Amino acid sequence: MAGGEKYERPAIAGSGTIATGLAACASVASKVLLLARSDASAWKAEEQAHSLAAKIDGGDAKRIKVTTQAGDLAECDLVVEAIVEELGPKVDLLQTVGDAAADADLATTTSSLSLDELASQSGHAGRVFGLHPFNPVVKMDLIELCLPDATNDEIRPRARTWCEAIGKTVVEVPNEPGFVVNRLLFPYLFDAVRLMEQTGMGAEEVDSCMTLGANYPMGPLALLDLIGVDVAVAIGEALHADSGEDHHRPPGRLIALVDAGKLGRKSGAGFYEYD
């Protein structure tokens, strides 16, 4: 396990929106290594992380280094897995980075998959814990922290210190699927989609009701586009598999959007069209 009171050599494993946002935030506190799976994804991730770092007070693009080699993580004391919300790929990555960075604490950004399964199947139980940020990472203040029973208690203060150092507010949450935010949020989002299915209302009409009537900063359909429709489906499927409750089941319209490649903002189309 990592020693000391704080992380000095963090790494982020992933090249998507959450990974690059975390890398940008981490650059406020120290150098950070970003692990991508291919040269093409590494180039895109570096460009995105550098761009985001420039938008953060104290962010420093020069502190962000990108690699495609897991062996480069050998000296890291924290590795944060931030890839697709699927058990198999996350387990494989945690196993790989845990072997490569033998002394590092291992965080996962999941909120819907079982931390206990991720820890046990990766072979690194005791080192794995949950750090769940929110999209867009550079703007959202919260990180949910979750330590399974098997996780070394010494990780807790290190994790809190790091999150605060990169400008986030930490709330420790129970080891339950969805933690707090997604457990409350996704039934609401899915109900908005079902309302469209049942009534024929448009996305703008539903969103306007919530932004103007409930003073929400963003409507549920626009928020689904921001989260990523595919990510929302994956989270819903994981929540439903655990609870069996209908309000966790992704609506058919969401699944149809994924099948059509309409994943929200990142693909240029979802419930709305984007330039």
At which residue positions do the language-model features occur?
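NAD(P)+-binding Rossmann beta1-loop-alpha1 motif at the extreme N-terminus of oxidoreductases
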Residues: 1-55, 100
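NAD(P)-dependent Rossmann-like dehydrogenase/reductase catalytic/cofactor-binding core
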Residues: 2-6, 30, 37, 164-169, ...
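Structural motif
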Residues: 13, 67, 82, 108-110, ...
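Short glycine/serine/threonine-rich phosphate/pyrophosphate-binding segments
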Residues: 18-22, 88-90, 111-115
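Rossmann-like dinucleotide-binding cores of NAD(P)H-dependent redox enzymes
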Residues: 36-60, 147-154, 170, 177-185
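Rossmann-like NAD(P)-binding element
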Residues: 37-41, 54-105
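Rossmann-fold dinucleotide-binding core
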Residues: 105-174, 179-183
